[in-house]
Amino acid sequence: MSQQDSQRWLPTDRLIYGVLVKSFLPLQRYPELVYENSNYANVYVGAEVYVFEESVDKKWCRAYQCLRPFPEEFISNMNSANDVLPDVKPKVVIFPRKYVHFEAEKAVSTMPFFKAPSAEDFKPLISKECESRSFCDSLYVSSTDDISTGKPRKTPRPPFPFFRYQKRSFKDEMGPILSLISSHVYSMYSIGEFSIYRKMIKLYYDLDTIRFRLSMNLTTEAEKINLIRAATSLRTKIAKFLSSTYRKNKLIANSTPRNPDPYGFEGIFARDIDTGELLSYEIDKLRTLVSSSMLCGLTNNFPTVPVVESDDESSSNGLFGTVRSSILVNLKDLAWDPSISDPKYQDLSICVYLRTKDEVLTESFTMTKSSNMESALDEIPAMLFKNILETIVHKNKVYLVVVLKETIAITTETAPEISSYNISTEESSSHSPFSPFNSSTENKIDHVKKGLAAGVINISPVFKFYNGLSVANKAQRFNLYLYSSDSSDSQNFNSSKDADLGWGGLINKIIKDSSEGVSVNPRAVSLSVTVKEIIGKQEAEKVLSTSLVPIRSIPTYFYDTMFSQAERIYLNLGRVSLYGLPAADTNIENVTVQISCRNKAVKFCKNKLEERSGDWKFVSVRPNESIGESIRIEGVENMNEDETLRVLVYLNGFLMAKSNIHIKKKNEIIEYRKGTVFQIMSSKSVPLIHLELEASYFGRRYNINPAITNFLVLQTKNVEFDQQLKEHYSVTLKQLNNVSFKDLLKHFDTILAHYLLLLESVNEATDKKGPSSSLPNIVFSEFVKFLNLMLTHQENSRYWFNRLYKKVMSKELECPNVAPILIKHMTTIFDRSHSSWTRTGTAICRTILYIIVLAIGSSHSDEMPNFSHFFRSLHKFLMLADEPIMADQILLIESIPSMLETMTNHCKVEDLVRFAIGLFECCQEKEMNQKMYSRPLSVREEEYLNTKFNCLLKLINKKVLQNYLTNTESVDKLRLQFLSKTLEWLLTPYTPGDDKCFHVESLRLVNSVFITIIEDYKFDMLQRNLIRLLPYLCKSFVHLRRYCKKARLMRPRRVFTMLFPREIPCNYIPVDSIVNDEVVVEVLLELAIIICEITKIASSRFPSYQSFSEIINLCDKDTLFQSNFYSRQITNENVYTITKTVFLFFKQDWFPGMKWLGVSALLGRSSLILLSLCKDYIIENNSPSPSKESEKRVDMRLWAEYVKVILLVSNHKSASLTKLAITPRKAVYLISGDLKKISAYILNECWDALATGHYNITYAKKYGLGALSDCQFELFVHNQFLIREIFIFAFHRHIDATRICCKILWGLGLNFWRIFGSLQPAVNACIPELFSAYQIGKLRLNDYELERFVSCLFFMMHVPDSDTFFPACMDFLRDLLGFLHIVNEIYKIPNQEEFDDDRTARHIEMFEYLLEANRPELFHKMIYDLFIHFIQKKDFVQAALSLELLAGTYAWDSNDTLEAISFPPLPEQSSFERKEYLLKESARNFSRGQKPEKALAVYKDLIKAYDEINYDLNGLAFVHDQIAGIYTRLQSIDRLVPTYFKVSFMGFGFPKSLRNKSFVFEGLPFEHITSMHDRLLRSYHGSNIVHSQEEVDMLLMNPPMGKYIHVASVEPCLSISDNYNSSDKKSSINNKVRMYIENRDLRTFSNSRRLPGAKGVTDLWVEEYTYHTMNTFPTLMNRSEIVKVTKSKLSPLENAIRSLQVKIQELYGLENMCNKTLKDHGDVNDLFTELSTNITGTISAPVNGGISQYKAFLEPSTSKQFSTDDLGRLTLAFDELVAVLGRCLTLHAELLPSKDLKPSHDLLVRLFEENFAEEIERYSRTLSEANRSRNNMITARIISHKNPNKKASFSGRDHHTSGSNHSQFVLEHSDSFGPNSLLFGKYLTRTLSHSSTTSSLDKSGIVSGTSSTFLAGSQPNTNTDSQHKHDYSHSG
């Protein structure tokens, strides 16, 4: 491709998605390309690109690359969970077209609002009269540079596809999700959250497995749904894990404000549970959207585990009882002790059944298998235990029992005998009790059943009742531990009290958790059991019919109406014992009981599925043990009139006793209670065995209760009732109701049918004789009581009733026509309820539903009863207000929905609707009379309200009524009347009030009814009137939230309930353990959803009606909807209420709005619809007009509230689409849509409306905007927070939002110019609000957004170049954009402690703008925080620099008055006084921090102020005194010299404030470079140290990822006068002077590098680099950026001099440190090592000769080459070196830690004298001459007569004596508390009361004493008028 073609690019018609299939790495071969064009980059295989341009020859592409973060970025930038996670970044790259594979089928969604701004976008906003160019055009024309904001030269490139996954499917979303997880894995590892890190890794692999299976279509449809649900659940866990890592770090004051989770990674979003697609606003129900969000956010494993049952999973028929459960059981993995290799089971039988603690629930399933248990367990079929009653599950724990028995062979060689049988003299051995029978066939048995082990497990957790839907339809695995019976004590046990002894009592002991008599059999230790609940009869039958493995159905043990009940008897054997013999005295090992019957039709079995047997051998036990085995006896109907069971008892296999037991006698089955004892006789017909047994009969043929028999024989046809017969009937009926439920249940159908016949017969007889008889009432009363007894709380009888009802309805059974009779009796009782109410009435309320069913079923089509009178009687009853009757009213209301449903086939639906209206109207009237909605309620009243609204909910959900009510084909007035009345009933509980007591549970049912009406009833009239309810609902929301807060409902909880419950009380759902401290107020969420649904109706069904006023006018003729709840007109109060509601929506203290972003987006969209409905009203009724009087009527507070909530919604986190990650962005947009477009439209309309009637044509022509008014100005100036919100809104990446905000900002600026003639007030208003936006973390900028905003602002601004307004605009823009630039830069600084200094520096720049904007308090607060921080660290120099910086903000103005401030605490005073005070404190802290040079500089500034501004002589005296003290102290101060380092930062791991920049750092005294390395590595985590300058140059050329630091030592550059000669001065003074000069103006440093080619020091040339810093040291943060670098060459001699000076300075520092350590009595061991090493290296260096090598320059052969002056300087340097070396050697001798080192010291002295002999001699000679000269000068001064008073003056000032008035400083009492007095009183008093010698100075500052605590302590008094009075009087 030619160069010309390469520069020509053609845009594609759309963004094209592609993936690189080959890496393109241009920078590997040509790294310099990166400097030619930033689009050149290395692009690797797999890169995701979006092409937007192609070259002309189609060979090259330019595209966006989704640049994923590298691991180094996480390590470099992540320090805590608060830090912003590195995300995908768009980068424009160039690559060959052939390297990419395009996937054109993947559509890329581009949003028009992301477009780049252009002039065309702003033309509609500019006045047509405008004659000037835009700012953008002006800059473009006036500049020859290519300005980014100028006119585009080609078609702008499309925006980056932020919504690239908007139209992708669920499985396509898995890719970015996995990429996101990998980012989180890196981030969690980087911040040390290793537990979350490991969980994230597991999530990654789980999701990747699901992605693979879905992508490859490796699933069935059912599996696909399960995988999608699992993936949805895992995605939600990601958000929860991330949320759990969030910690509220206590950041220091100058840290960058952080908006937690800016990307929405913690966001919870609702998905379709079957497809996995995100739910949307347009398609899905809002109730589903919010409920799914709540379940995802609060529960574990949703939607994998269902939490709420669907509508069709509820009770299938509430009329006939709840759905029963069945339990599916499967046995696996019988385990034995590892010590046993083979348990050797013998004909093992396994018995399984269910029971509670007290009763057996099912028959047992028994199966006998071979000894090979590996195959035996596989052969055992699964067991289905059917029809477990719900009442049993609710009241008891359900246990699964497994019993293992084996059949073993026994030997019959050992006959039973007694070990020690006492025989009297009269008796013989023939009297032994053990005498076998002579029968040859039955006298012995060779096999017995022995109990091996048994186990019990509580399986209650598998029932949905206990754990909800999380366990429904899911099998649970249990490990069932097996135990055996320990019968060692049974031999000595003879008491009959313990029935649980031995094998038969083992199960009870295990249940009771008793260890007595329980052991472990190593042959059977445990068993694995799988248990699953099957709900409903149909599901159970489905399992049986579709299972691929055999399943046995096990019936119940009790009399169950759902099974075909065969006649049967259950026989259970208890304890068996020897009669009169202790078991321990016998050799009996086993007792076996066998039963049989001579009647061959009588059979025995364990359950009805087993093969029947003519006899049954029970398990063998030892004497005194319980057998505990139950069997079933069948063939009861074939028994003789008298029937017995034959009982045989074998002892050790020998038949020793037998007897017959009656089981039937005189045609009655004999039942034996538990514990009944029978004596079994021996062959000698004497009792030998005591046997306990229990026999229970289950059947209805025998043992019928006499009362039932008497009732069934009552005549029902052609009966003539006399008084005696009436009494007989009455007594019989009452006796019947006294029969036990168990007996009544067996004959329930017969009794019920006979009762109906009896009702008909008695009624007919009464009709013939007249109404005087009371028998019909008695019969009806007893009938109702019978129904109440049998049907109210009993499931079995309801099933019988159901069967009877079905037979009647199918005409299989003829039923007497008792309908009129039943209705008449009930009507009569309800009519009389106001005067008398009996138990019969209560029974009717309990059973009215069943009575109505009987009435409907028994009525003939031509004789349908008239229900109207009956309905009216019910209405009367419900009007009663008596508290006792309310319980019966509740029962009646509960039955209404099912009752009406039953009547739908026999009554007109319209009649039922009228009845319902009347019923609820009666309830409503009673509630209003009793003021139920405005006072606390009793428990009964609450139950009543809940029942009423639950009834209403069920009613509108009943299919027949719903079909009628939802029919929209015709307009039916009754239908609309019912709906309008329903809305009134629902809205009444919401009636607002200040002290309103809301009944939350009732309101939740109200909400359920309300949402059902909104969702299912689509009448236009209804829906448009629902919109009129919005103001009322908003008001209700405000009051309800206030009540919830007052009632403490807005607190974190560990449980929650489903939204819109179907019944109260609700089922509580536990919160996931990952989730902490979430507040969810369900009732508020429900009401918010209702409001959202209605706003959705307004926007979708009535889009052409854009205001409340239009909707209200549309509903004028809707007479049914004109109650007080509906708005008839909109008022200011309505608008205030709506804005308050929107504000509370986003206050979000009632649900986790920052996490449930989908719900927040929904509330945002609904809020904007609400506000848009109010817009027309506000504009029409609250806009200004040309007259000033009308402007006064404008409610600016209303405008402020309205605009505030618009911006609140628009600036919410859920509205920041580009800030969100890819999936949250997609989810939010599906719900919220383009919110900002609506917001921008409303804001534009409002802004223009505020200028209604005000149009400035001049401004329109010159500046492009003419609609300007004082109202606009007042709105934003009096509510300046709106300016902040406008700026935040402007920086959203949305063209409409930005351009409208720019219009408003430009208009606001024009208003400022129009009113003030200056833009400085605009700066004062904008800058603080921008800072406020930054502080709260909402003003988050990047380079592109700032550039975009500037472009839009320049397109909007129109100012003629020659206009006086132009310079003001430029100044305004300079301040505004400068501040925004700082905000932009500060967000590039990572939020880690290591970058605090960079952040502080940026904050200081930021506060300079705030100072200019007349907002110094923020700056003051920051400086004060810094000061306190440094004082606490005892870093007095940094504290002083902070105060100096603060003092610089004040002018030397003594005529103004400043208000008192809190930070720092300063009184009311002038600017001069405040600045003076701060400078003095700064100087004091400089002195305390050993920086007297800085203190001198401060005092010199004060001298200038005192001398030139206010002529304060006292101040001058004080300052000069301080300066004199400092100069004096400088001559004797011992202080340590810090080390300085040049530090360079390279790599993209550093922010721009550090990257590729160099600084000079002030280190610690004598700090080694390795120590600086360690400190920097600790501060800048993850950094690498670079050691060579060559590496630094390479890194600067090609910056890599990561962090790289280079450190080099630098030395301060001294600037000493050439006239300064140290030879005549003491070396100690010379050292102090040198330190003074060095620290006086320290901002220049140097280091050097050797040049190659030198052979020795005399020809060694070096390059010296001099670094100039921005600030003078000491400086804030102990560092300053290098702003200038100069390079120069040093000759060999200059290098020698420089090296000597450096060494001298180093030795001076060591000397000072030693002196200071000795003075402070510190540890000298480490110091001695450092001193010894340095002296040794100086005197006699082992390598290169050390310092002595520089003497070569003084040799005659070499000295000729250099000038005499330079050689003189070298000589002086050697002299000074000798002096300091001598002192150091003296210190070395003093510091010797032991005498053993004295020889080493002597050697050093000797070497010193040898190597520096010439210098020592010269220095000694010079020193002697200097001493003689000085002595002569002092003598001359003493005897001089020129100044006789000098000595007196000296003594008079500095030698003050007690009692004299010389130089006395007088302080008045009133002057001692001013700010200046504080300083003078502290400093001058001490100065004048002590001598001026250095003894008055301590080590920490100018004077001794405690430091001032003015900043951290109390505030001084503010008496500024006091003057210090000095009286310097001297005596003669």
UniProtKB/Swiss-Prot annotation:
Region (Disordered): 1908-1932
Main location: cytoplasm
Oxidoreductase as UniProt keyword: no
Source domain of life: Eukaryota
Pfam families assigned to the protein according to its UniProt record, in alphabetical order: C2_DCK_4th, DHR-2_Lobe_C
Gene Ontology molecular function terms on file: guanyl-nucleotide exchange factor activity; small GTPase binding
Protein keywords: Cytoplasm, Mitochondrion
GO cellular component term, pick one: plasma membrane
Subcellular location: Cytoplasm; Mitochondrion
Recorded phenotype for the gene knockout or disruption: Leads to hyper-resistance to cell wall stress agents such as calcofluor white and Congo red.
Gene Ontology BP terms: autophagy of mitochondrion; intracellular signal transduction; small GTPase-mediated signal transduction
Skewed-composition ranges (Basic and acidic residues): 1922-1932
Cysteine pairings via disulfide bonds: none
Xref: InterPro entries: DOCK (IPR026791), DOCK_C_lobe_A (IPR043161), DOCK_C_lobe_C (IPR043162), DOCKER_dom (IPR027357), DOCKER_Lobe_C (IPR046773)
Job of this protein: Forms a transiant heterodimeric complex with LMO1, that acts as a guanine nucleotide exchange factor exchange factor (GEF) for the small GTPase RHO5. DCK1, LMO1 and RHO5 relocate to mitochondria upon oxidative stress and trigger cell death. The DCK1/LMO1/RHO5 signaling module mediates mitochondrial turnover under nitrogen starvation conditions via mitophagy. The DCK1/LMO1/RHO5 signaling module plays also a function in cell wall integrity signaling.
Subunit structure: Forms an active heterodimer with LMO1.
Miscellaneous comment text of the record: Present with 238 molecules/cell in log phase SD medium.
UniProt protein name: DOCK-like protein 1
